[in-house]
Amino acid sequence: MSKPTREEAKEAVRTLLKFIGEDPSREGLLKTPDRVINSYAEIFSGYGKDVAKILNTKFYETCNFQDFILLNIKFTSFCEHHILPFNGTVDIAYVPDNCIVGISKLARIVNIFARRLQIQEKMTVQIAESVQENLKPLGVAVKISAVHSCMSMRGVMQDNSVMNTMHYTGIFAEQQKYRHEFLNLTAKR
C-alpha cells in the first residue's frame, strides 16, 4: 500500500466535510484540511518508532528492591474502530532481574503505542510484552483504565464508563501474590 500524498489526504478531509453536510470552501473551514493533516501527523506519530531503542539505555545494578511500579501515566489514543479518542492512565510494574530503565522510558513507550490507532486490549499487551522482551525482568504487570469516546459520543452514550484491562507476564502471571499486590497498589488512587 502506498502512502497518499499530502494533497490526497487534504482532499479526503474535504470529502468528509462534504459528507457531514459542510462546505469546505467556507471561511472557517478553508484551512481545516491542513490543520487535520498536521494534527494527524502528531497524533499518530507512534508509527515507525522503535520501542527497543527507547528501552536500550539500561542501568545494570544490584537491585535492592522487590519490584518497580509507575502509576498514573496519562495518555490519549484513538480507537481503530471509530477513530474516536479514548484516554486514561497506565500503571506499569516489573520485577527486575538485573537491570532497570529510567522512569521516563516507560512513559515514552506508553506514548509510542498510544499514538497509533489502537484498541485498549491490544495496547495493554503491547506495553507489557515490550517491557518483558527488552528488559527481561522476572515479570511485568500492566493495567490500563480508560474512558472511550466511542461509548460516550455515540451508540450507548455512556460517558462515565471506565474500561480496565490488565496483562501479566512472568511471576505476575504465575503467582497470585504479585498480581494481588499490583492490583491493591493500583486501586488505592
Curated annotation (Swiss-Prot):
EC number(s) from the headed UniProt entry: 3.5.4.16
Q: Which UniProt keywords apply?
A: GTP-binding, Hydrolase, Metal-binding, Nucleotide-binding, One-carbon metabolism, Zinc
Q: In which pathway does it act?
A: Cofactor biosynthesis; 7,8-dihydroneopterin triphosphate biosynthesis; 7,8-dihydroneopterin triphosphate from GTP: step 1/1
Q: Is Calcium one of the keywords UniProt gives this record?
A: no
Q: Which GO terms describe its molecular function?
A: GTP binding; GTP cyclohydrolase I activity; zinc ion binding
Recorded GO CC terms = cytoplasm
Pfam families recorded for this chain?
GTP_cyclohydroI
Q: What GO terms in the biological process aspect are recorded for it?
A: one-carbon metabolic process; tetrahydrobiopterin biosynthetic process; tetrahydrofolate biosynthetic process
Name the residues that bind Zn(2+).
79, 82, 150
- Asked if the record carries the keyword GTP-binding, the reply is yes
Catalysed transformations (reactions): GTP + H2O = 7,8-dihydroneopterin 3'-triphosphate + formate + H(+)
Which family, according to UniProt? Belongs to the GTP cyclohydrolase I family.
Q: How does it assemble?
A: Toroid-shaped homodecamer, composed of two pentamers of five dimers.
- This chain's protein is named GTP cyclohydrolase 1
Instruction: Give the organism, scientific name.
Output: Rickettsia massiliae (strain Mtu5)
Task: Give the gene name.
Answer: folE
